[in-house]
């Protein structure tokens, strides 16, 4: 049983390691698609503790500041489209430097638990990829 679980774990790791890095255009379209899913592109959107263009929580702002090693972002920055994208890229730069789109969406939807739980955030990934593919097809 342990061998099967180890093999399955290695397969999941292998899939993540072989993921293609998104181009700048693909990455920007992915961010657009996440924002469409999260807030309908509304930088003033609010849903409980989640605020702004990318629906950022206070916990995420704190994590971005921890990564930056200083207080670079404020809670009000969540209302700025540009600062929201910068926070998204800060998180992804630390935890997803390979710009794997599946992992990017799962981290955004489920949090850092997605790094260990490969099913976390999969529903959001499927929903966002529908938006993404539609958006890319319109270009």
Language-model segments: which ranges?
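Sec-dependent N-terminal signal peptides
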Residues: 4-13, 19
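Cleaved targeting-peptide boundary
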Residues: 18-27
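N-terminal targeting signals for Sec/Tat export/insertion, comprising classic cleavable signal peptides
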Residues: 29-61
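Secretory-pathway/luminal and periplasmic proteins that interact with or process carbohydrate-rich
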Residues: 39-45, 112-122
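Alpha-helical segment that forms one wall of the substrate-binding/catalytic cleft
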Residues: 58-116, 124-134
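Short, solvent-exposed mixed-charge patches
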Residues: 138-139
